[in-house]
Structures are given as C-alpha cells and as structure tokens.
C-alpha cells in the first residue's frame, strides 16, 4: 500500500463524511458508487492491480484509500496549502480532478482550461485568494 502523507490522512475523514457509503441512485450518471468511487473507476483499479472485477459495493478501506491517494490527492493537493488542499480534494472526489481545477481557476479569475498552472497565479493566489474565494463559493473546510 501507499505511504500516505499526514495531510492526506487528516483530510480523508472530512471527504468520507461527505461521501458516505454505497449508493445506486436512478438518474445518477455515475451509477453504482461507494465512498465516492464509481463502478467504472473501481473496475479499472482492480484490473490494474490484477484482481477480478467485483461490485463497488465490496470496496475495501485499503482500496478506496489507494484510489483517493492516486487519483484525487496526489496529482495536485500536495502543492496546495492546508485548507485549500481539503477543499480541492473534496471537489475532486465529488466532480473529478479536472472539474476541481476548473473551479479553482474560475474563482481566481485565470483562464479556465482544467490544466493546473500554479505558476500563472503564484503561490499566494492559490493559498490566500483561492481559499477566501472557495469559502465564498461554499466549499467545505
């Protein structure tokens, strides 16, 4: 298993509180979901790990933590300040990492393309302006 960072482990309970457990709501384009992980993503994870496909309803703590770490935390959150990392992580799990980047770009007022350009806005913008803007946007901390 991955060697998770202290910040990831500190933020994880907040995201899990939002994500809850298993759901398969009619009309939800993601279909069957458990801990915010859709069936297709779980299938890919298990295939890559050399494991047989099974229902996302059976996902283990080790599996969802590994998916959160690799797909939602590690690509961008280590570069963000505390608080902002949690908000970004939560948005990424709820709507995908590209959507999370677009929301951050939108609130800062830079070109919205879904590709993170931290140097475009500078560390101060990502840590203070975005933190304040995300609070106004209604993002949880």
Q: Would you name each region that the model predicts?
A:
Residues 1-141:
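Cell-wall polysaccharide-cleaving catalytic domain and substrate-binding groove, primarily
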């Amino acid at each position: 298993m991955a060697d998770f960072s202290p910040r990831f482990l500190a933020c994880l309970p907040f995201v899990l509180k939002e994500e809850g457990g298993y759901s398969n709501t009619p009309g939800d384009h993601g279909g069957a979901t458990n801990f915010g992980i859709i069936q297709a993503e779980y299938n890919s994870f298990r295939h890559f790990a050399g494991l047989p496909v099974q229902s996302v309803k059976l996902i283990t703590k080790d599996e969802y933590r590994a998916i959160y770490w690799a797909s939602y935390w590690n690509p961008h959150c280590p570069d963000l300040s505390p608080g902002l990392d949690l908000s970004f992580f939560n948005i990424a799990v709820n709507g995908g990492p590209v959507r999370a980047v677009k929301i951050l770009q939108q609130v800062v007022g830079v070109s919205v393309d879904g590709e993170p350009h931290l140097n475009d806005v500078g560390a101060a913008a990502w840590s203070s302006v975005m933190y304040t803007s995300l609070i106004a946007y209604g993002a949880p901390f």
